[in-house]
């Protein structure tokens, strides 16, 4: 365990770089960027992107990541009544991933009211929005599910 201030660059071991930034969530949350062996994993849970734009801190954290695990709790149809709750839509996740040059977007932090059939629909729509495969060989958009294991 180590205390740190978001924005601090840490090197817990030789060759490992860990960056962080504050996220937009009531009560605060921190996002992380892990760089190791020429690969980048960005993890952003509990964050709400500003409406119709991308937060520059989040864009920098996600820049050219092989994997972006991102809070995609809602859909665009649901977000209007949930603004200020500190969560994003999968469509916002796609926009962030595209703007940041992300290889694979991992859609996670699902709304508990979304069942498997609903999430299968999100997976189809996200795959259509980010078709093809990333340089890492993975699809450009994946919906996280129990037991999923990924390697950048």
Write out the residue ranges for each language-model feature.
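Core dinuclear metal-dependent hydrolase active-site scaffold
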Residues: 1-56, 60-61, 147-152
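Cap/insert and terminal regions of metallo-dependent hydrolase folds
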Residues: 40, 48-145
């Amino acid at each position: 365990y180590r205390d740190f201030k978001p924005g601090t660059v840490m090197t817990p071991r030789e060759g490992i770089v860990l960056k962080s930034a504050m996220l937009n969530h009531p009560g605060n949350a921190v996002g992380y960027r892990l760089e190791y062996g020429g690969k980048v994993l960005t993890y952003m849970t509990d964050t709400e992107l500003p409406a119709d734009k991308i937060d520059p801190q989040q864009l920098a954290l996600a820049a050219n990541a092989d994997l972006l695990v991102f809070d995609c709790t809602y859909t665009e149809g649901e977000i209007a009544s949930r603004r200020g709750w500190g969560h994003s839509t999968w469509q916002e996740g796609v926009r962030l991933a595209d703007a940041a040059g992300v290889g694979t977007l991992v859609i996670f932090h699902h709304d508990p009211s979304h069942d498997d059939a609903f999430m299968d629909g999100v997976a189809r729509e996200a795959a259509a929005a980010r078709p093809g495969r990333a340089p890492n060989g993975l699809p450009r958009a994946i919906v996280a599910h129990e037991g999923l294991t990924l390697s950048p």
